[in-house]
Structure formats: C-alpha cells, structure tokens
Design a protein with these regions (language model features):
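Extracellular glycan-recognition regions
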Residues: 1-209
Length: 209
C-alpha cells in the first residue's frame, strides 16, 4: 500500500479555492456545480471540480472524506472519470437536518443512474474503490476499519466482462487507463469545504466470486 500524492494530479474544472499537498486535498465548492447526465431531470451538468490521477492497473483506492454541508445536494467523495458521458461518483448528499443520502451515480453512454440509502449525516466517512478490469466495487465505512458494500458496477467503455475474468485472483491485467480521484460540489446556492486525507492505493483487494 502506498499513500497517494495528488500534487501531480489533473483538475477537471479547477476550483477558485483549493489546497493540494502530499498529505491531503482540500476543495471549497462553488454554487451551481455538479456532475449529472440527462436521467429524470433532462439537464446535463459537468462543471464540478475533480482532481484525478491515472492508472491502467487493477487497484484499491481508499480515502477519508471530512465535510460540513450547508444546503441541499452538497456532496463530496470519490470519482472515476472517462469522459463527460461515462463516469462514476460516490458521496453523501445533504438532504435536510433529519437525514442525508449515501449513494453512488453510475453514468454510462450519457445517462446517470443514482442509487441511495438514507442515513443520519456524519461529519466524515471513508470510501474504498476497487477495480477489476471494467468492473468496480465501491464500499464505505464510518470508522475506517469495517467497510460495507455500496455497489458493484460496470463501465461500458472499458469493455466486456468474461467468465474467465470473474474467476481470476489476482484479476487479469488490464491495459485500459482510467482517471480517478476526488470531487466536491454544491448543486444549489451553497459552498462548503471538503477535505480528503488518508488516501492510499494498493493492488486490488476485491477477490473473485
């Protein structure tokens, strides 16, 4: 396991206020920023800030996220970004003082799919993202020790999944590069600061079924 240094990362929609060191990333959101494509609402939003690194390998990426949300739909978490019509994000989205939505959005071929569960709003959470070729596992934890599955998903642009791939430990090598990292945004008239720490990268821990 190695700690991830995002100082050489690449920005999508670099924010006006951010800090990137060898130990943490801090993003202050701007109002009316988001990632979403078409489904239900019809609109296409792709102006949220995200800081990315590239890998062609199978991996497990873990990060702690700390935040103090202000308004509806404030969110921050992990992201995979292939292009504006093929990407993934995981986060807690602020709903109201009673609950928020822990969930993930998978966007394939220009349409977003949002899956959530309602939870009391914490001030921090850990996410763990694992890659096996074109398939991914996203998990979350409230203590950084015990992780629970949120979702298994596929990104179509990375190709098909075969029975042979599903049986291999470690996963079969992949040569297709993915960009992944952290993001934060405020879909409404809001702003908050998200801080990402304890960011690590290691060989894929997601075993074959």
């Amino acid at each position: 396991m190695v700690m991830v240094n995002f100082t050489a990362g690449k920005w999508i929609s670099e924010p006006k206020v951010s800090e990137v060191t060898s130990e943490f990333v801090s993003i202050t959101t701007e109002p009316k920023t988001d990632f979403w494509q078409r489904s239900y609402y019809g609109f296409r939003n792709e102006n949220a800030p995200a800081l990315l690194i590239d890998s062609k390998d199978n991996f497990t990426f873990t990060a702690k996220v700390s935040f103090a949300y202000q308004q509806l739909f404030d969110q921050c978490g992990l992201i995979i970004y292939l292009d504006n019509e093929n990407w993934f994000k995981a986060s807690i989205e602020y709903e109201n003082q009673s609950f928020s939505r822990l969930g993930s959005v998978v966007t394939n071929l220009g349409y977003s799919d949002w899956a959530t569960t309602d939870i009391p709003l914490p001030k921090e959470i850990w996410y763990r993202l694992s890659r096996r070729g074109p398939d991914f596992l996203i998990e979350s934890s409230f203590d950084g020790l015990v992780f629970n599955q949120m979702r298994i998903f596929h990104l179509h642009q990375l190709g098909e999944t075969t029975i042979e791939m599903a049986k291999c430990n470690p996963p079969l090598p992949t040569q297709k590069v993915v960009s992944f990292g952290v993001y934060a945004c405020s879909s409404s008239e809001s702003s908050f600061t998200a801080k990402f720490t304890e960011m690590s990268l290691e060989p894929c821990k997601w075993l074959a079924h």
